[in-house]
Regions:
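Transmembrane alpha-helices and immediately adjacent membrane-cytoplasm interface residues
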Residues: 56-66
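Catalytic core of membrane glycerolipid acyltransferases/transacylases, capturing the structured
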Residues: 25, 32-49, 53, 61, ...
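Non-catalytic C-terminal accessory region of glycerolipid acyltransferases
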Residues: 4, 8, 138-265
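Generic preference for hydrophobic
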Residues: 68, 82, 105, 213-215
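Glycine-rich helix-loop-beta junction characteristic of Rossmann-like nucleotide cofactor-binding loops
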Residues: 70-75
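Hydrophobic packing residues in well-ordered alpha-helices of helical domains and bundles
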Residues: 5-8, 12, 46-51, 229
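A hydrophobic membrane-anchoring feature enriched in long, contiguous, low-charge segments
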Residues: 4, 8-37
């Protein structure tokens, strides 16, 4: 009986959260349309700020607490290629809380097909169809152009949801080759709790609680060249994997997780 009651309450909570999600989106939508007239760069930055405004309203109203931890000082005025683990539908919403600076995420082209949200999505991100080599090349060309304007980019190097019990899936090469080509430092960032707040199995798994964001040490690329891309990818992967285990990320198989007394943060 109690289990049925809890499931009913979670269902009602999810309906409430989705109604708020859409209502706030519709509230900012006219301003998104106006901002889009300002062009890819200026207009995109304006739309990003509107998305930040959306997130600043939505997260408190659905009782999700964003907590940030900086393992090293983070300079918001500096340009980075951010790389983040991808474990939940909620990652897309959390990223506008995580990155409070001009930035363009690389995202799936399929999300742009959703009414209203898709329009905002396409104006705020660089879309990629990973099934098309031509489209992947075009997306990297756009990212290079954005970096040349002094704007940071965000890449989920796993490409798709990590549906395993491992800390991370294998990384694609694109972010690391782009970093070497443009001499842009990499900043790894961890989303520790988005899986717990809303796992990848269903959109109706959202629940309130904390959502931790951890900013790891910057990884410079000034002394590296293009043949070093595999080394750079492994260095970033190893660091993120190590930290996810240290922070006891909940999706990791028990044998690889730390004892509670050794968990940090």
């Amino acid at each position: 009986m109690m289990r049925l009651l809890l499931k009913s309450l979670q269902f009602l909570y999810n309906i409430y959260a989705m109604v708020l999600f859409v209502a706030i989106m519709l509230l900012i939508f006219p301003f998104v349309i106006l901002s889009s007239l300002a062009g890819r760069i200026k207009g995109g930055n304006m739309i990003l700020r509107l998305c930040m405004f959306w997130s600043d309203i939505w997260f408190p109203l659905v009782f999700i607490r964003i907590k940030r931890k900086y393992e090293s000082p983070h300079d918001k005025s500096k340009q980075y290629i951010f790389v983040t683990n991808h474990i939940s539908y909620l990652d897309s919403a959390v990223l506008v809380k995580a990155y409070r600076q001009p930035i363009r995420p690389l995202g799936k082209v399929e999300m742009g097909k959703i009414p209203v949200f898709g329009f905002i999505y396409k104006k705020a991100i660089v879309s990629v169809d990973r099934s098309s080599l031509e489209n992947r090349i075009a997306s990297l060309r756009i990212l290079r152009s954005i970096l040349s304007k002094g704007i940071s980019v965000l890449v989920f190097p796993e490409g798709t949801f990590n549906m395993t019990n491992e800390p991370l899936k294998d990384f694609y090469d694109g972010a690391f080759r782009l970093a070497l080509e443009t001499h842009t430092p990499i900043k790894p960032v961890l989303f520790l709790d988005t899986y717990d707040r809303m796992n990848h199995k269903t959109l109706f798994s959202l629940n309130p609680g904390r959502c931790r964001i951890v900013y790891l040490d910057e990884i410079p690329v000034t002394d590296l060249k293009m043949p070093d891309a595999p080394f750079l990818k492994k260095r970033v992967y190893d660091l993120m994997e190590k930290k996810l285990i240290e922070y006891n990320a909940s999706w990791i198989q028990p044998a690889r997780r730390l004892n509670k007394k050794n968990v940090i943060y």
